[in-house]
């Protein structure tokens, strides 16, 4: 139970967290419209003759309001797939830690699935960043270019995972070798 000085007690803290102004002043009604009183007054003094025409047009606050555009990321399956990839990574990262502590060798199929699901998770995360910060409605060419670059980088990374799994011992073994102090035995893509 939260108490505000001089006001009634608030039983539910979620109202304070969600909207602290309404929690402190429950009877206060705040308007979210911008006030153009001084600007409209100047315009009204300058355009006295156009009073009949302005009633037919929409007011300035209605003209300025634009409903939010539909987002590609909202209500799509991409969020669900990203969540599935995120929760799949939890057990897949625990198994290599267990294998490294016990001295065992990790299965190559498990190593390939760990690295490819990690790549899928990163690709979904970067796709959502592109959708949020380079909107298709505002920057159509840059949005498409960013997505093509992301897909190209993902395909190149998938080829790198294939090379790592077939020519080396895999992603987990590479990380294990990178954490070792002696790097004489480190072999990455044809370099000694």
Curated annotation (Swiss-Prot):
Origin organism lineage: Eukaryota, Fungi, Dikarya, Ascomycota, Saccharomycotina
Transit peptide: 1-42
Protein name: Mitochondrial import inner membrane translocase subunit TIM18
Topology, Mitochondrial intermembrane side: 110-113, 166-192
InterPro entries, per the entry: CybS, SQR/QFR_C/D
Gene that this polypeptide is encoded by: TIM18
Bilayer-spanning residue ranges: 89-109, 114-134, 145-165
Family affiliation: Belongs to the CybS family.
Keywords noted in UniProt: Membrane, Mitochondrion, Mitochondrion inner membrane, Protein transport, Transit peptide, Translocation, Transmembrane, Transmembrane helix, Transport
